[in-house]
């Protein structure tokens, strides 16, 4: 079967790889000059199979009000007269209950664990290198209240069989020795030892090369304009360089997916939540992280990527804008220099990307109401973590094969009739 994938980020490329392995003739179309040049370019570098939590959680509405007045706030809200933004926010608020949080977190952990297995197998069969490390994620707590509040995450990890360790201050330092200089600033942590780190951009580029060797055609520098539907199925995708036809189509355009689907009468509740990162050359390894440290106070991840530190995080709801705010950079700099001052900040690269977020935090993977049109989008902050599992799952769905994990609650249908997820 001929399959056209729209989008060459990590989700589009993993989808292409698995579809090609399944024997399909695959073409990937993207407006950029190569793979992973938008949201997949400089994300935080976490591959956090255990650290999967919905942003929509009990207490978040109250915390959000407090964050609005913080200098280094993890959440920035710039309201617009935008029905899509308002509807998305209302649905997200509806997911901020204990019951919804447990359901959504369980879905995320299921897909993340599947992706862990898929990534390990893919790494074995391809031997690609992407500055990967397998030393876990340390969620770092600066206050006793944060440590106490982590009990709900520990409960969910235990219920889903995800390995974890609750650490005191000294144990945190044994895991991340550079924290010794900041011991007075921390009280403890939660370690998920099976988590990994890696450069998503490097991974996606190398996997694109492997996919090309399997026959995948990458058509870069081609802007997607609209989908053509006739007789209940897609008959082509119109681009600035003509129309591409296929037997099946996969929309993997991240935050831009809803804009392509809306004219077809398909409402995909995905909205861009901007994140920021700094990539800092290491000058003193003894003051740098070994793996990923999640600074719970600022919701910022500090990750070791070879000879660089990647600092990423924050959530800015401001629509489709990639402008770089100086205040956001100061927050990233504050977090990393406070804990790991081993980089040359004068040579840091500042970046932003639009994460495609659903109101419940879980991606949308699978069929639509149009027979040959599929979606693989809405992974939010966990696109890198969930990429291999999502690509493999999508390939099974398109191929009509039995999926290896339950996927009914990952489908777009969970939002039918005004449901919240």
UniProtKB/Swiss-Prot annotation:
Pathway: Amino-acid degradation; D-alanine degradation; NH(3) and pyruvate from D-alanine: step 1/1. Keywords: FAD, Flavoprotein, Oxidoreductase. One of its GO terms (cellular component) is cytoplasm. Pfam families: DAO. The keyword Lipid biosynthesis does not apply. Oxidative deamination of D-amino acids. Belongs to the DadA oxidoreductase family. NCBIfam families: PRK00711.1 (NF001933). This is D-amino acid dehydrogenase. It comes from Allorhizobium ampelinum (strain ATCC BAA-846 / DSM 112012 / S4) (Agrobacterium vitis (strain S4)). The gene is dadA.
């Amino acid at each position: 079967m001929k399959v056209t994938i729209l989008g060459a980020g990590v989700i589009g490329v993993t989808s292409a790889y698995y579809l090609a392995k399944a024997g399909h003739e695959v073409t990937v179309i993207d407006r950029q000059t190569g793979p992973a040049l938008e949201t997949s370019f400089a994300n935080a570098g976490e591959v956090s199979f255990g650290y999967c939590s919905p942003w929509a959680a009990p207490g978040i509405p109250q915390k959000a009000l407090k964050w609005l007045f913080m200098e280094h706030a993890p959440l920035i809200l710039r309201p617009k007269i935008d029905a899509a933004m308002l509807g998305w926010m209302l649905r997200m608020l509806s997911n901020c209950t204990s019951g919804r949080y447990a359901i959504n977190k369980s879905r995320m952990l299921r897909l993340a664990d599947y992706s862990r297995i898929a990534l390990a197998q893919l790494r074995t069969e391809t031997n690609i290198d992407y500055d990967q490390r397998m030393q876990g994620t340390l969620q770092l707590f600066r206050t006793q209240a944060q440590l106490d509040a982590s009990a709900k995450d520990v409960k969910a990890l235990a219920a889903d069989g995800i390995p974890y360790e609750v650490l005191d201050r000294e144990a945190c330092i044994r895991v991340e020795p550079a924290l010794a200089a900041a011991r007075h600033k921390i009280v403890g942590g939660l370690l998920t030892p099976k988590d990994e780190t890696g450069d998503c951009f490097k991974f996606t580029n190398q996997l694109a090369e492997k996919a090309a060797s399997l026959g995948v055609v990458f058509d870069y520098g081609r802007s997607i304009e609209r989908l053509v539907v006739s007789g209940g199925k897609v008959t082509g995708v119109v681009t600035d360089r003509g129309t591409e036809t296929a037997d099946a189509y996969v929309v993997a355009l991240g935050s831009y997916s809803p804009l392509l689907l809306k004219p077809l009468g398909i409402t995909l509740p995905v909205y861009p939540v901007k994140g920021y990162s700094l990539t800092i050359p290491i000058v003193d390894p003894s003051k740098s992280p070994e793996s990923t440290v999640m600074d719970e106070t600022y919701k910022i991840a500090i990750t070791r990527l070879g000879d660089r530190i990647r600092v990423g995080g924050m959530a800015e709801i401001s629509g489709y804008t990639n402008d770089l705010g100086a205040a956001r950079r100061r927050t990233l700099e504050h977090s990393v220099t406070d804990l790991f001052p081993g980089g040359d900040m004068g040579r840091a690269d500042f970046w932003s990307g639009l994460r495609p977020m659903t109101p419940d935090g879980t991606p949308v993977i699978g069929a639509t109401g149009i027979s040959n049109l599929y979606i693989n989008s809405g992974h939010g902050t966990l696109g890198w973590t969930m990429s291999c599992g999502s690509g493999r799952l999508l390939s099974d769905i398109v191929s009509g094969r039995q999926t290896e994990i339950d996927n009914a609650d990952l489908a777009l249908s969970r939002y039918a009739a005004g449901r919240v997820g």
